[in-house]
Regions:
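Aromatic-lined carbohydrate-binding/catalytic grooves of carbohydrate-active enzymes
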Residues: 78-113, 136-156, 182, 198-204, ...
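Substrate-binding cleft/loops of secretory-pathway carbohydrate-active enzymes
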Residues: 140, 195-198, 237-295, 316-325, ...
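Active-site-adjacent "subsite" loops/lids of carbohydrate-active enzymes
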Residues: 130-182, 191, 216-230, 241
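Aromatic/acidic polysaccharide-binding cleft in carbohydrate-active enzymes
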Residues: 295-362, 384-403, 536-564
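Mature N-terminal, pre-catalytic/accessory segment of carbohydrate-active enzymes
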Residues: 32-91, 100-102, 106-108, 119, ...
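The substrate-binding groove and active-site-proximal loops of carbohydrate-active enzymes
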Residues: 53-68, 96-111, 154-172, 222-239, ...
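A conserved amphipathic helix/loop scaffold
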Residues: 254, 289, 323-330, 338-340, ...
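Aromatic-Pro/Gly-enriched surface loop or interdomain linker
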Residues: 334, 362-439
Length: 677
């Protein structure tokens, strides 16, 4: 009846109009919007495209809300048509950019800007999420007992204690306020896992001793029980995360929760908290490569996921801002994520009064159009197993000296060398691949010096059953000496320049190396120069499969200074084992290949990664590449082959179980779509 009265004003009598007005006012007071009139908003699991705004408000913010108007928000939505907006409410300094009753508000407001954001987004059917700094809170650290204590006994200036009262007295009440008073859809908790630190407060040390029985507390790497101390704090973070989610959802079960970078390549492990989605943001200096790695890991985590691009480039080292990115640059960075089935968002700064820079939205509109053209084809697509690159959970946690630092440079370099050889690669953890190793024709273990014994056995069994295992680096090779048939000589030489002889000679810098002596069944692949012909790598048959290793590391060198020689060496070695990939692409080394499936279609994603995107933070234009020859192995002749989203129908031939397609030109991202019905 209410909807009929509103939609047909001629039917409204004076009494019914009065009654309707009272009801509408009551709804407005109770929830901030008229729920009966609100379009349905997408859950994050179904969302594809968003915009993130934040400004890490501080004590300088004295007129927040002065220029936050409905027209400003309407303009964003009209230009970009996002599924969600994500806006600032509390950054790392700890000041809240809305008039909170439970937190620490900035000094001055003009009205209530958060109610304006919520009212407009609800009316337009756009979800609203909060950017909220979790563990990192400078202001909270000033309060007694709320800061983590450093090894020197001094309070940490940014990281709150996982053993103090911050979570229960501020974080949970404030998220409840956002969920129940402001009716926002969810939260993207920044400064969380990556901001957590070791804590030497009395409550933390008491809990550590009680949990482990260890009385001696390590203060620095190398001291006894250092790893155990780190693991204790990692588990404390997990418990804290589960606790805060449970408490907030008691008040608002539909509230959607994400802890930025938790259960991603920053924290590579099984999802152990009831987060609603996973997310992270790119490296603002080297976005393509950070997206390549993070997206390939997230796609197998079993949760809805997205990644955030930065709309500008900056240096973490000197905080230099290189300026805004072009639409083309962000389109390519989006393509890396979209091609792997993920959602995409872009970060824009808010002004110090909380309003946005309207002039930046037309560029975002161009990026949004590019993404939307690919949404129905790519969103929620899944990889076709080809090469698995291991991001080892125990290997990673034994390697780093922080709780959840992203020190995966070696693995990232190996990934880059493989994808720049046009290999379709996934980045997987043990939990993502155990029990299904046989699905992958090749598994690569990149420079890990520790693996759990059970998983090592699973890898060996995989090879004996017909799989192919490639180990990169002497320390990784040392874990499989009997299987490789190698006797390693002397000690691992520390990182330095290593010369490799293989159809010529090339140098790998920042490389650890170790000589070795092979048994009669192992075949040498290149040699380490100046080492009396000891192998640079080797291959050996083991059962029905093959196992290979390099006796020099190459990930750091390739990550920092990619070279054709290093890439070619690794790809040739991989190709000795992985002889029959589903797809081959020829014509350029500047193309990433992502082999995916979605809705019964085989998708060969091609991404133009040409140019100096590693070293030049701003890409003014992307030069098209091509023509490319794409060969797809398939048992039956396809019913249809198209290029999407362009809609072109290319000529193709099918012979001997192979589809051959020519892509005349690749500007940024195109998909060869193979349909069999």
């Amino acid at each position: 009846m209410m909807l009929q009265l509103i939609c047909n004003p001629r039917r409204i009598t004076s009494n019914s109009f009065y009654f309707a007005t009272l009801v509408l006012l009551g709804l407005a007071v109770a929830g901030g919007t008229v729920s009966a009139q609100e379009p349905v908003r997408l859950k994050r699991a179904d969302s594809f495209l968003g915009i993130h705004f934040d400004f890490h408000a501080g004590k300088d913010c004295t007129n927040v809300g002065a220029h936050t108007t409905p027209a400003m928000i309407e303009n964003i939505i009209n230009l970009v048509h996002p599924d969600y907006l994500q806006i600032d409410c509390k950054g790392h300094p700890g000041w809240s950019s809305y008039p909170t009753k439970v937190g620490h508000p900035v000094p001055g407001f003009v009205g209530d800007p958060l109610r304006v954001w919520r009212s407009v987004t609800a009316k337009r059917g756009v979800a609203l999420y909060m950017h909220y700094s979790g563990v990192a809170d400078d202001h909270a650290c000033q309060l007694p007992g709320w800061a983590a204590i450093n090894a020197d006994g001094q309070p940490n200036q940014r990281a709150t204690s996982l053993f103090g009262s911050y979570t229960d007295r501020l974080l949970i009440p404030q998220l409840r306020e956002l969920a129940t008073v402001y009716k926002v859809d969810g939260v993207w908790v920044d400064g969380d896992c990556w901001a957590a630190v070791r804590d030497y407060s009395e409550p933390a040390l008491k809990a550590f001793r009680a949990a482990t029985g260890i009385q001696s507390v390590p203060r620095k790497p190398g001291e006894p029980y250092w790893f155990e101390f780190l693991e204790f704090h990692r588990d404390a973070f997990r418990k804290n995360l589960r606790h805060e989610i449970a408490e907030v959802k008691k008040a608002s079960p539909a509230f959607q929760f994400c802890s930025n970078w938790s259960f991603t390549d920053h924290m590579p492990e099984p999802v152990s908290a009831p987060v609603d989605f996973l997310s992270g943001d790119f490296d603002p200096e080297n976005s393509v490569n950070s997206a390549r790695f993070a997206a390939r890991y997230l796609v197998r985590q079993g949760k809805p996921w997205d990644l955030m691009d930065w709309s500008f480039a900056m240096s973490w080292k000197d905080k230099k801002n290189y300026g805004p990115k072009t639409a083309e640059q962000m389109q390519r960075e989006a393509a890396v994520v979209v091609a792997l089935g993920g959602g995409f968002q872009v970060y824009f700064k808010q002004k110090r009064d909380g309003s946005i820079y309207d002039e930046q939205m037309p560029v975002m509109a161009e990026v949004a159009k590019f993404c939307r053209e690919r949404q129905s084809l790519c969103h929620h697509s899944e990889p076709v197993p080809q090469i698995a690159l291991l991001l080892s959970t125990p290997g990673h946690y034994r390697k780093i000296d922080s709780l959840f630092g992203r020190n995966n440079h070696e693995a990232n370099g190996v990934l880059q060398a493989l994808v720049e050889s046009q290999q379709s690669v996934e980045v997987v953890g043990e939990h993502q691949i155990t029990g299904r190793l046989s699905q992958y024709p090749l598994i690569v273990v990149p420079e890990w010096d520790y693996l759990d014994l059970q998983f090592k056995k699973e890898l060996t069994d995989y090879v004996r059953a017909g799989g192919n295992l490639l180990l990169v680096g002497p320390k990784t090779a040392a874990l499989f000496k009997p299987e490789l048939g190698v006797e390693l000589l002397g000690k691992v030489k520390p990182a330095g320049s290593v010369r490799i002889v293989k159809e010529g000679e090339f140098t790998v810098r920042k490389s650890e190396s170790q000589g070795g002596r092979l048994d009669a069944q192992s075949v040498s692949f290149g040699t380490l120069a100046g080492t009396n012909q000891t192998p640079a790598a080797s291959i050996k048959s083991l059962g029905r499969g093959k196992i290979a290793a390099t006796y020099f590391s190459l990930g750091l060198d390739y990550r920092d200074a990619p070279s054709f020689a290093v890439r070619n060496f690794l790809n040739e070695l991989a190709s000795q084992m992985f002889t029959n990939p589903i797809v081959r692409v020829e014509g350029s080394a500047d193309v990433d290949v992502c082999l995916m499936r979605n809705k019964g279609k085989l998708l060969v994603n091609l991404i133009n990664t040409s140019g100096q995107h590693r070293t030049e933070p701003i890409t003014k234009s992307i030069v098209p590449i091509g023509p490319l020859t794409v060969s797809i192995r398939q048992a039956v002749k396809p019913a249809k082959v198209t290029l999407q989203p362009s809609g072109e129908v290319p000529k193709f031939d099918y012979a001997a179980g192979v589809i051959n397609v020519t892509v005349p030109q690749l500007k940024i991202h195109e998909v060869v779509v193979v349909e069999n019905k």
